[in-house]
Amino acid sequence: MAQTKENNPAPRAKAPAAPKAAAANGTVPAGEKHTRPTTRRPYYNRRPRRAQQPKEAATPIHIYPLGGLGEVGKNMTVYECNGDMIIVDCGLVFPDSEMFGVDMVIPDFTFVVQNKDKIKGLLITHGHEDHIGSIPYLLQKFSLPVYGTRLTCGLIKNKLEEFGLAGKTKFVEIVPRQKIKLGCFTVEPIHVNHSIPDAVAFAIDSPAGTIIQTDRKSTRLN
């Protein structure tokens, strides 16, 4: 009798074994790949991060613009830190056509007169009238040393002679890059280019930080 060969069915592929569970300490068994979940937490469910607030200076500095802020002319700024004050510029502004009978407009000196014992000096950036024009009227209230470059001091002296104040005022001639110590302030004059010679800006260093004071149209020279 002829023998017949049975048709055996093809072997089925084995189902992939289930991945072994991770150990209690979070390690993955040898031979297994560590996969990250594909689902992510919706953005709106995330906890918002608190914005970092700027750190306040341990020693604050106060700036009082008595003129020249939002206007052209009458430049005068007072800086206060650690109980010390300095003044930068003391100018005037000429009246417009609607100010009949007014020759000039000067800053209100009430604040500086009330704090005259704290003021260490008056620093002048350059010799334009909107920066030096009110100095005689301030020095009539009380005396204080005036710091400026050679040309600037010369222009101020000529102005003070008309008021009889030139011999009563102490002038300190400053040179760019030579620092001046006034109370807690250290002021460095910086040579700048302006429409009048011998103009400077000031780098005013204090325990609260450094501030650059200059005229609005000045540009630095290297």
Model-based region annotation:
Residues 1-55:
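Intrinsically disordered, low-complexity RNA-associated tracts
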Residues 42-123, 128-220:
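His/Asp/Glu-rich metal-coordinating catalytic cores
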